[in-house]
């Protein structure tokens, strides 16, 4: 088993409650079976493009975390063989900082 962790230091989003700008640090951990990840794995650019797309419209931190986990859990045979995915989001909403963690 192999775990690969990607950390995105700052992703901007729009708050669905007040329309303000939210800032997130996002950590995505993929656990792959055996050495399968060497031939087929999620690229940082793919993740970054997805984050940019889903944060164009207002989204809550919880919904952001869930969408990332579901999108990259590897259910399709053409996708990387992800055994487990953990998504951690650390949000800054004005003066408030929050952490959300989801594992599938």
Language-model features: where?
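N-terminal intrinsically disordered, cationic/polar leader segments
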Residues: 1-104
């Amino acid at each position: 088993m192999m775990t690969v962790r990607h950390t995105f230091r700052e992703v901007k989003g729009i708050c669905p409650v007040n329309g303000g700008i939210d800032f997130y640090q996002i950590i995505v951990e993929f656990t792959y079976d055996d050495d399968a990840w060497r031939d087929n794995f999620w690229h940082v650019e793919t993740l970054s493009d997805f984050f940019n797309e889903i944060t164009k419209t207002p989204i809550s931190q919880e919904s952001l975390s869930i969408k990332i986990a579901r999108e990259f859990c590897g259910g399709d045979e053409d996708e990387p063989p992800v055994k487990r995915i953990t998504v951690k989001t650390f949000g800054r909403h004005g003066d408030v900082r929050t952490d959300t963690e989801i594992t599938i």
